[in-house]
Amino acid sequence: MIGHSTQEKIEKLVQSCGCNLYDLLLLKENERSILRLYITKEVGVSLDDCAMVSDLISPLLDVEDPLAGEYFLEVSSPGIERPLKRPAHYQHALGELARIKFADKNEIEGEIEAADETSVKLKGEEPIPYSLIKKAQTFYRW
């Protein structure tokens, strides 16, 4: 697990590149440990942005050594269809389409009209408290 102070340092380094830290995940895929950073930027994330963030973060991780053993660092954009986990994610996605799943297996789709610290509102629907949401993500209608 990444400590709070290390995560704050990572966030500051990402911001120094003109980007924002969207999410940070520690996963295991095919027996490999992966530290995956998702970054966003107002005008979109480029490959150069990802490389710059990776180059800045790597020395910090070498010193802080937040993970036991070998791991791979991956830096990318969360993509057009991205998970919504925090109020800031919903606020950043105003006007976008979202699919929200509830614990009772029901789901709803719609355009995000408003979001605050406690709930999200889809166009034509009542506000939905985050506590009722099991999983949510933006989606693009192709």
UniProtKB/Swiss-Prot annotation:
Job description of the protein: Required for maturation of 30S ribosomal subunits.
Stated name of the protein: Ribosome maturation factor RimP
Similarity-based family: Belongs to the RimP family.
Biological process, per Gene Ontology: ribosomal small subunit assembly; translation
Intracellular or extracellular location(s): Cytoplasm
A family per Pfam: DUF150_C
InterPro entries: Ribosome_maturation_RimP, RimP_C, RimP_C_sf, RimP_N, RimP_N_sf
Keyword tags: Cytoplasm, Ribosome biogenesis
Cellular component annotations (GO), alphabetically ordered: cytosol
Gene field: rimP
Highest taxon, organism lineage: Bacteria
